[in-house]
Curated annotation (Swiss-Prot):
HAMAP family reported for this sequence: Ribosomal_bS18
Alphabetized UniProt keyword annotations: Ribonucleoprotein, Ribosomal protein, RNA-binding, rRNA-binding
Native species: Fusobacterium nucleatum subsp. nucleatum (strain ATCC 25586 / DSM 15643 / BCRC 10681 / CIP 101130 / JCM 8532 / KCTC 2640 / LMG 13131 / VPI 4355)
Signal sequence annotation: none
Protein name: Small ribosomal subunit protein bS18
Entry keyword RNA-binding: yes
Family, similarity comment: Belongs to the bacterial ribosomal protein bS18 family.
Length: 72
């Protein structure tokens, strides 16, 4: 049986750019429903994924990005 390896998405963001005030960048790491995307989709390593999650949670807390999207 042939083995498959998933192609890992490369993250083209520096750790210094990830900040809770950078809303446009953080929206790339949040799904349409408002959930934080996993590192297998974002391509971030564990340390960077924790930094992304912390920044998203801070931005949500001060209402820069919504917790969930609004249903119509």
């Amino acid at each position: 049986m042939a083995e498959f390896r998933r192609r890992r998405a490369k993250l083209r963001v520096k750790a210094e750019e990830i900040d809770y005030k950078n809303v446009e960048l953080l929206k790339r790491f949040v799904s349409d429903k408002g959930k934080i995307n996993p590192s297998r989709l974002t391509g971030a390593n564990a340390k960077l994924q924790r930094k992304i999650a912390k920044a998203v949670k801070r931005a949500r807390n001060i209402a820069l990005i919504p917790y969930t999207r609004t249903e119509k």
